[in-house]
A protein has these predicted regions:
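Walker A (P-loop) phosphate-binding motif
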Residues: 2-28
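Conserved beta-strand scaffold positions in the cores of enzyme catalytic domains, especially
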Residues: 7, 36-38, 143-145, 194-196
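Catalytic metal- and UDP-sugar-binding loop of GT-A-like glycosyltransferases, i.e.
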Residues: 12, 146, 199
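ATP-dependent small-molecule kinase phosphotransfer cores
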Residues: 34-129, 134-135
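A glycine- and Lys/Arg-enriched "phosphate-lid" helix/loop adjacent to the NTP-binding pocket
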Residues: 104-183
Length: 223
């Protein structure tokens, strides 16, 4: 597959870092002079994400009961279907694809049970080989990792969820699980050398405009 387009992924250290907002701002800015295609994974509303939806609701078993490779396959099926049917053609035409989550999320979540760094690295290598080479989906040209202080992000996220009455999924059930995800994200982002944007300052979120400026600096380097 000829690499003509650009594949930009926005990933976060945990929930509540503002990826969706930054994706909208990025699309708005880039659309001024280039064609963009935006997508959010998992692809809820598409049959390809049905297993993911059931898994996150706890319908397929408890988190510690399901092998990592099986969980990975739920997400990989969704990504492969969407890439083959919706994104591949845009990429081949030289357009910019903007993704909220991607294989990057699996690297973070599916290494949670790994006990050593070597096990984490081995798991990541297997997932990369499976999805990028066996399934043939696109490999990111740029991964922007939104990071911040865990306690600040958790406090703000819980306040939003309580006000909105949001139902938590299998990964969001406890702060302890969220902390493990956060710690996994720190390792993966450093190991894979993702470009980092900090979204907190002190005990508060930075403004979305300031964060957007940092994002644009990274994207301009790619272009």
């Amino acid at each position: 597959m000829e690499n003509k387009g650009k594949l930009i992924v926005l990933e976060g250290a945990c929930d509540g870092v503002g990826k969706s907002t930054q994706l909208e701002l990025l699309e708005s800015e880039l659309s001024k002079d280039t064609e963009c295609k935006r997508w959010h994974f998992p692809s809820y509303g598409f049959a390809s994400s049905d297993m993911v939806r059931l898994f996150l609701k706890g319908k397929l078993g408890k988190l510690d009961e399901i092998p990592d490779e099986v969980i990975e396959s739920y997400y990989a099926i969704d990504r492969e279907y969407v890439w083959r049917n919706y994104l591949k053609k845009y990429y081949a035409e030289g357009k910019t694809i903007l993704l909220d989550r991607y294989t990057t999320s699996s690297f973070i979540y599916q290494t949670l049970k790994c006990k050593t760094e070597d096990e984490k690295k081995d798991m990541i290598a297997k997932m990369k080989a499976y999805e990028y080479y066996n399934l043939g989906i696109g490999e990111p040209d740029l991964v922007i990792f939104f990071n911040g202080d865990f306690d600040t992000l958790t406090k703000l996220r819980l306040a939003r969820e309580n006000n909105a009455g949001i139902q938590k999924d299998i990964f969001e059930a406890s702060v302890d699980t969220q902390r493990k995800i956060y710690e996994s994200a720190q390792f993966v982002s450093e190991y894979l050398k993702w470009d980092t944007v900090n979204v907190t300052e002190g005990n508060a979120m930075r403004s979305k405009e300031d964060i957007h400026q940092d994002v644009m600096k990274l994207v301009r380097k790619l272009r």
